[in-house]
């Protein structure tokens, strides 16, 4: 065990699944298929073994937060305001953050009676491509400086205080912010915030994004496995873009497959791997729970902060 994990309890999949009584997953195989990222793999068995115990743990954290807020209200002699329970989900590109987040959204809405759950990705807080070009950092897209961190912090602050917020929308198909399009985010019972940068510090070191989170999850895997999943996803995006000239990936459908593979590998090495090693993975120990995935996408180990 490295020093990084000294304050985590390592739990095997077998032990973890025994921490929650066996119940039927509150979704169908078809629903699960519809929410998973198209290069990801997940089964109803994973839902039962990993995600139902995780939802139960989140319930414990939520109850603890509410008890503390109530006690603070008594101490301050005023009524405590209800606040959204905010969950941060981080991890590398192509590791399966989106699948985890969408699955949690369904599980929380169905295991908590009448609960409302909003899901936000931090892609919407990337600067538009034109801004990145003007600043000379288009090749740094995805790195910390390519995000409008002030806007992200402002969003979290307003949501935490029970305000509804409109945020920009990012499209992976056009590889840019969609002009004039907004996502209306309600101050729901749960707000899941997913992105590679959600545990990172903005330029203002006095305020941390993680300060806004009531629970946090890091989806982890070996670097070689993530690279393989990224390259697989890149090539699968081409099949979706074949008849869509507006897609960012369309131009690659006109290139020899060898050139496409070389380009994707170069992007992984120069951008995604560098970003992972320098900025994403170093924030891993800020999570409450680390879900480690094996080569076949199956979660084999769970690390719970002590």
Curated annotation (Swiss-Prot):
It holds the Pfam family PRK. HAMAP family: Pantothen_kinase_1. The keyword Mitochondrion does not apply. It is found in: Cytoplasm. The keyword Phosphoprotein does not apply. Gene3D superfamilies: P-loop containing nucleotide triphosphate hydrolases. GO terms for molecular function: ATP binding; pantothenate kinase activity. GO terms for cellular component: cytoplasm. It comes from Streptococcus pneumoniae (strain 70585). Transmembrane segments: none annotated. Keywords: ATP-binding, Coenzyme A biosynthesis, Cytoplasm, Kinase, Nucleotide-binding, Transferase. Belongs to the prokaryotic pantothenate kinase family. One of its GO terms (biological process) is coenzyme A biosynthetic process. SUPFAM superfamilies: P-loop containing nucleoside triphosphate hydrolases. The gene is coaA. It comes from the Bacteria. This is Pantothenate kinase. Signal peptide: none annotated. PANTHER family: URIDINE KINASE. Pathway: Cofactor biosynthesis; coenzyme A biosynthesis; CoA from (R)-pantothenate: step 1/5. InterPro entries: P-loop_NTPase (IPR027417), PanK (IPR004566), PRK/URK (IPR006083).
């Amino acid at each position: 065990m490295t020093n990084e994990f000294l304050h985590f309890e390592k739990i095997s999949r077998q032990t973890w699944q025994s921490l929650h009584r066996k119940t039927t997953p509150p979704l169908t195989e078809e629903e699960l298929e519809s929410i998973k990222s198209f290069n990801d793999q997940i089964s109803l068995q994973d839902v039962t073994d990993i995600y139902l115990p995780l939802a139960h743990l989140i319930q414990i954290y939520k109850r603890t937060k509410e008890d503390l807020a109530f006690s603070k209200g008594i101490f301050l002699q005023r009524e405590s305001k209800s606040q959204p329970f905010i969950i941060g989900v981080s991890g590398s590109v192509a590791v399966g953050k989106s699948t985890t987040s969408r699955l949690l959204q369904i599980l929380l809405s169905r295991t908590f009676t009448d609960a409302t759950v909003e899901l936000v990705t931090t892609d919407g807080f990337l600067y538009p491509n034109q801004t990145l070009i003007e600043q000379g950092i288009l090749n740094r897209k995805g790195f910390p400086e390519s995000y409008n961190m002030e806007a992200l912090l402002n969003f979290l602050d307003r949501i935490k205080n029970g305000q509804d917020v409109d945020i920009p929308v990012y499209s992976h198909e056009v590889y840019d912010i969609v002009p004039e399009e907004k996502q209306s985010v309600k101050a729901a019972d749960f707000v899941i915030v997913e992105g590679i940068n959600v545990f990172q510090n903005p330029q203002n070191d006095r305020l941390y994004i993680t300060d806004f989170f009531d629970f946090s999850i890091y989806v982890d895997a070996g670097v070689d496995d993530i690279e393989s999943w990224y390259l697989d996803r890149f090539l699968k995006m081409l099949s979706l873009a074949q008849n869509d000239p507006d897609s960012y990936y369309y131009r690659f459908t006109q290139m020899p497959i060898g050139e496409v593979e070389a380009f994707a590998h170069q992007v992984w090495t120069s951008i995604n791997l560098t970003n992972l090693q320098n900025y994403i993975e170093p924030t891993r120990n800020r999570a409450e729970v680390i879900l480690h995935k094996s080569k076949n996408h199956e979660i084999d180990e769970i690390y719970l902060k002590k």
